[in-house]
UniProtKB/Swiss-Prot annotation:
This is Guanine nucleotide-binding protein G(s) subunit alpha isoforms short. Residues 364-369 are annotated as: G5 motif. Residues 219-228 are annotated as: G3 motif. It is a lipid-anchor. Belongs to the G-alpha family. G(s) subfamily. The gene is Gnas. It is an enzyme of class 3 (hydrolase). A lipid is attached at residue 3 (S-palmitoyl cysteine). The keyword Translocase does not apply. Residues 42-55 are annotated as: G1 motif. It comes from Rattus norvegicus (Rat). Guanine nucleotide-binding proteins (G proteins) function as transducers in numerous signaling pathways controlled by G protein-coupled receptors (GPCRs). The alpha chain contains the guanine nucleotide binding site and alternates between an active, GTP-bound state and an inactive, GDP-bound state. Signaling by an activated GPCR promotes GDP release and GTP binding. The alpha subunit has a low GTPase activity that converts bound GTP to GDP, thereby terminating the signal. Both GDP release and GTP hydrolysis are modulated by numerous regulatory proteins.
Length: 394
């Protein structure tokens, strides 16, 4: 019996030893995971709808992952290239849908605007009728006549005049870009370029995480939907983020939001920024402000058709600050406009600033890869300092 007792004790000892070793392994892994987690910079992308958040994420993939492939983790270049081509093929449908939505929206708006817009060539009316007849066709297969009608209409001066008034209705930003490329997109062997994929508009619903590495530093970027009904989901992302990147469509000063067709888009962005800046859960998280769509802002300002002071009367009294640094060759009117918009946001951050978090503004053009590369490089030092502060190492 004694031997049996000893044998049982031996089994118990072995089991306890194995358990201790297992616990050690688990503890070691937990410590390792904790170190990786603490070493990761988590960036939360926020902003109103259609400000360019998803385009910023696409640029991170181009710059720091493997472009437009599935996961971005392939070490085999051939596999990465294969995945990239596969994803581009699936995006063709999204691009065609953007093209269809663009021409449909413009021709449908012609009769609804006040005053309405007439076709320059009345013989194109049958083309308008065709476009409107296929507006709600599910799984549309894009026959040759669609491209023929769309191209002829896009060349009609009346349709162009309606496009010029697109701030009076809801039109996707990429409309002109894809309508100008009808002859390319209609080809059976069409493969989208990176620029096509950057321009492609697909509504973001839910929360998407993109992981990438820059100089051996891990970044996790969270992109959430910008429309009002998506915002309640944001709180899930707020836990332990290093910084918020708040994206603004600077060119939206003369537009209204899709949700109610009344609220000014830039005012909506200012209101949202204020609510985030003053949120009690975010009082220690600094904000990197991307004043986006600078290319479209410059176009609008120089066209002179929609004046900022008609929407923001205080612009009439605004003077460009002395410390402004315009881009080479930039028109002074553009410089004044972009700094006015910047200062509207800084007014919010300085009014309620308590020294616990800061706002760092940058002028961006999300579809310009080199611009985003330069801006993100400028931001990395700021993000690093935020990260050190987050874990009280600074």
């Amino acid at each position: 019996m004694g031997c049996l007792g000893n044998s049982k004790t031996e089994d118990q000892r072995n089991e306890e030893k194995a358990q201790r070793e297992a616990n050690k392994k688990i503890e070691k892994q937990l410590q390792k995971d904790k170190q990786v987690y603490r070493a990761t910079h988590r960036l939360l992308l926020l902003g109103a709808g259609e400000s360019g958040k998803s385009t910023i994420v696409k640029q991170m993939r181009i710059l720091h992952v493997n472009g437009f492939n599935g996961e971005g983790g392939e070490e085999d270049p051939q596999a990465a290239r294969s995945n990239s081509d596969g994803e581009k093929a699936t995006k063709v449908q999204d691009i065609k849908n953007n093209l269809k939505e663009a021409i449909e929206t413009i021709v449908a708006a012609m009769s609804n605007l006040v005053p309405p817009v007439e076709l320059a060539n009345p013989e194109n009316q049958f083309r308008v009728d065709y476009i409107l007849s296929v507006m709600n066709v599910p799984n549309f297969d894009f026959p040759p006549e669609f491209y023929e009608h769309a191209k002829a209409l896009w060349e009609d001066e009346g349709v162009r005049a309606c496009y010029e008034r697109s701030n009076e209705y809801q039109l996707i930003d990429c409309a002109q870009y894809f309508l100008d490329k009808i002859d390319v997109i209609k080809q059976a062997d069409y493969v989208p370029s990176d620029q096509d994929l950057l321009r492609c508009r697909v509504l973001t619903s839910g929360i998407f995480e993109t992981k990438f590495q820059v100089d051996k530093v891990n970044f996790h970027m969270f992109d959430v939907g910008g429309q009002r009904d998506e915002r309640r989901k944001w709180i899930q992302c707020f836990n332990d983020v290093t910084a918020i990147i708040f994206v603004v469509a600077s060119s939206s000063y003369n537009m209204v939001i899709r949700e109610d067709n009344q609220t000014n888009r830039l005012q909506e962005a200012l209101n949202l920024f204020k609510s985030i800046w003053n949120n009690r859960w975010l009082r220690t998280i600094s904000v990197i402000l991307f004043l986006n769509k600078q290319d479209l802002l410059a176009e609008k300002v120089l066209a002179g058709k929609s004046k900022i002071e008609d929407y923001f009367p205080e612009f009439a009294r605004y003077t460009t600050p002395e410390d402004a640094t315009p881009e080479p060759g930039e028109d002074p009117r553009v410089t004044r406009a972009k700094y006015f918009i910047r200062d509207e946001f800084l007014r919010i951050s300085t009014a309620s600033g308590d020294g616990r978090h800061y706002c760092y503004p940058h002028f961006t053009c999300a579809v310009d890869t080199e611009n985003i590369r330069r801006v993100f490089n400028d931001c990395r030092d700021i993000i690093q300092r935020m990260h050190l502060r987050q874990y009280e190492l600074l």
